[in-house]
């Protein structure tokens, strides 16, 4: 059933995309790719990087068929507050994608417990520049892997998704498309003026009590539809197509006619919790839809774009 649903969705997206097809761009490898990879294909290993005076880490997964003569797309996946790169790899299934997967680890922030967090939240570690860390990380990946610099995508959950929103604002020259899930979009003082229109696909459960779908004025959290509409306006989208129902609990909203062929999509899970759609293991509190698989749906969206 799920495969049939996804096939119908893909057909609908392909038909609508004819309205504003993005410009195809030739893939560009970051180097001649003759340097051996830092680990065996098909494995996930913890790697280290010194950035901003701190020793940082990230979980790196190479596809089983990784070869040093092909330029690979890269997906950056940012964990939620208190989680880890390893934990996110487990529930997200992102490592099943035909791409290099990178799961960075945040720095322990403020508040209760020793919980890792990302820049832009009220509990983030003071003075830590995670945007600079992301740039250092991309520089490291470009130097050590055979990757396509034009096909770098960013996703994340909760606090990690909020940080992905920041990257969309300030790193549009390095991040081709973003896919936040259950995003915690706190006020961060950043004037969001990306250098180019950014394709966005956003996922959120209407029953999320951690980051409410309708927003939370006391915490400065916007209503999720308003946040998505902000990106549609930023990307100068002209057309909002009809909403499409997938199964009994998923509704997809789409904006087309956007500048430079970009698109904006919002995937609302009816009664969905603070969870990763399609997860088979714990990803947060509340209902988890199995109607869609977030990793497949976001990949089918972001892979259509390159810088």
Across the structure, where does each feature detected by a protein language model lie?
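N-terminal export and membrane-targeting signals
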Residues: 1-12
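Serine-hydrolase catalytic machinery in alpha/beta-hydrolase-like enzymes
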Residues: 44-153, 162, 166, 170, ...
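Acidic catalytic loop of the alpha/beta-hydrolase fold
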Residues: 208-211, 274-276
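A domain-start/cap signature at the N-terminus of enzymes
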Residues: 2-4, 22-74, 155-179, 183-185, ...
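Short beta-strand/loop motif that positions the catalytic acidic residue
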Residues: 202-204, 208
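C-terminal catalytic histidine-bearing segment of alpha/beta-hydrolase fold enzymes
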Residues: 203, 221-222, 234, 238-307
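Short beta-to-alpha linker loops that shape the active-site pocket of alpha/beta-hydrolase fold enzymes
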Residues: 105-109, 184, 272
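Flexible "cap/lid" loop of the alpha/beta hydrolase fold
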Residues: 184-200
